[in-house]
């Protein structure tokens, strides 16, 4: 029972990370940002447990590249006299994404006792299928639609103007891009990990059809 609850929480956290949204009560702070904040606590604890804690080399290199992108963005803004600051805080966005991912993967590892690419992919696939069902249910049930809109802000309302279905933090370009990525992930698993997922191929195919259709 405890493991089942842990898996359900893992699915919810995966959705919070992959399809972040804001609560109306906390404008400006989405679920991914909150998870990134939690990652600082986890990281501080883990570094404190090590006698010779060091910064990961790959993380350092990625941070330098992100800072360079932000610097180039600043230079182009000044040179071209524009106000497009889309990439000015790119390095912060990268840290938030990585921080949120760190919290999620540490929780999944805690629940399952291990961590693998396949396991993470399975959670992402499950979340996308879940979002499809939520979007469809909201489209045919005004009560559920109103309930969700009553406490979600930001991306929760994307899609209403176009009359399209939308999930929880999942709509328009956000949904299209990430659903496409997950469809490619399913194909990749079927082609390259057949021996390990042979028993579950029907489930992967059903997930593919649900995501493609809805």
Question: What is each model feature region?
Answer:
Residues 1-51, 71-79:
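N-terminal signal-anchor transmembrane segment
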Residues 1-10, 52-67, 116-123, 198-202:
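Membrane-interfacial loop-to-transmembrane alpha-helix junctions, especially the N-terminal start
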Residues 25-35, 89-90, 163-183:
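Membrane-interface micro-motifs in multi-pass membrane enzymes
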Residues 35-43, 96-105, 177-189:
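Hydrophobic cores of alpha-helical transmembrane segments in multi-pass inner/ER membrane proteins
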Residues 41-53, 78, 103-115, 187-196:
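Structural signal for the C-terminal ends of transmembrane alpha-helices
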Residues 64-68, 83-106, 119, 123, ...:
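Aromatic-anchored transmembrane helix interface
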Residues 118-145, 170-214:
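Alpha-helical transmembrane segments of multi-pass inner-membrane proteins
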């Amino acid at each position: 029972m405890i493991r089942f609850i842990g898996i359900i929480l893992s699915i919810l956290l995966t959705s919070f990370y992959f399809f972040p949204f804001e609560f109306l009560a906390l404008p400006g702070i989405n679920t991914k940002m909150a998870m990134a904040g939690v990652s600082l606590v986890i990281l501080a604890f883990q570094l404190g447990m090590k006698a010779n804690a060091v910064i990961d080399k790959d993380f350092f290199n990625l941070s330098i590249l992100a800072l360079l992108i932000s610097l180039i963005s600043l230079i182009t803004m000044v040179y071209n006299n524009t106000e497009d600051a889309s990439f000015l805080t790119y390095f912060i966005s990268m840290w938030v994404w990585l921080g949120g991912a760190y919290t999620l993967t540490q929780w999944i590892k805690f629940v399952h006792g291990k961590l693998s690419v396949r396991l993470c992919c399975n959670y992402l696939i499950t979340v996308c299928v879940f979002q499809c069902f939520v979007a469809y249910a909201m489209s045919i049930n005004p009560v559920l639609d109103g309930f969700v809109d009553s406490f979600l802000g930001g991306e929760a309302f994307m899609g209403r103007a176009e009359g399209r279905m939308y999930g929880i933090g999942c709509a328009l370009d956000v949904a299209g891009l990430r659903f496409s990525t997950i469809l490619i992930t399913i194909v990749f698993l079927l082609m390259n990990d057949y021996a390990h997922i042979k028993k579950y191929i029907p489930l992967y195919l059903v997930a593919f059809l649900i995501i493609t259709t809805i």
